[in-house]
UniProtKB/Swiss-Prot annotation:
Gene3D superfamilies found in the cross-reference section: Fumarate reductase/succinate dehydrogenase, transmembrane subunit (1.20.1300.10)
Pathway(s) this gene product operates in, as recorded in its UniProt entry: Carbohydrate metabolism; tricarboxylic acid cycle
Species in which this protein is naturally found: Archaeoglobus fulgidus (strain ATCC 49558 / DSM 4304 / JCM 9628 / NBRC 100126 / VC-16)
Membrane-topology annotation of the record: Multi-pass membrane protein
Sequence ranges on the Cytoplasmic membrane side: 1-15, 83-92
Classification via Pfam families: Sdh_cyt
Cofactor stoichiometry and binding remark: The heme is bound between the two transmembrane subunits.
Chain segments annotated as transmembrane: 16-36, 62-82, 93-115
Name of protein: Succinate dehydrogenase hydrophobic membrane anchor subunit
């Protein structure tokens, strides 16, 4: 029987800590996003309202931080899943490089879209 390792044992301590921090940060930011878009007014989801809201610097900062947290959390989690496999552990450097590259591409593309509004 193959013994499985937990994500905590596969990830380095800093990567595991960042996974926990980004998870908690996402709870706060998604709650704020949900409140603003669904609880304040029924017009909050109209295109004009969304563009007006996202044009404000504080909302750009909120969404940029949410984008950073979600992107890191997703690709760090994917890295942990891949490192749980035998093939992933044999190619640990490649797995780390590819997931880091994917994180950076997703984050910077998201920033480009956010700031092009």
């Amino acid at each position: 029987m193959v013994e499985m390792e937990s994500a905590k044992s596969v990830l380095e301590p800093l990567a595991w800590l960042m996974q926990m921090i980004t998870g908690l940060l996402m709870i706060l930011l998604v709650t704020a996003h949900f409140y603003v878009t669904h609880m304040t007014t029924h017009d909050a989801l109209r295109y004009a309202e969304v563009v007006e809201r996202v044009a404000q610097p504080e909302f750009k900062a909120l969404y940029a931080l949410l984008l950073l947290a979600v992107s890191f959390h997703a690709f760090n989690g994917l890295r942990a899943i891949l490192l749980d496999t035998n093939a992933g552990m044999r190619k640990k450097g490649a797995v780390s490089a590819l997931t880091t590259l994917a994180f950076l591409l997703a984050f910077f593309y998201g920033l480009y879209l956010l700031f092009s509004i």
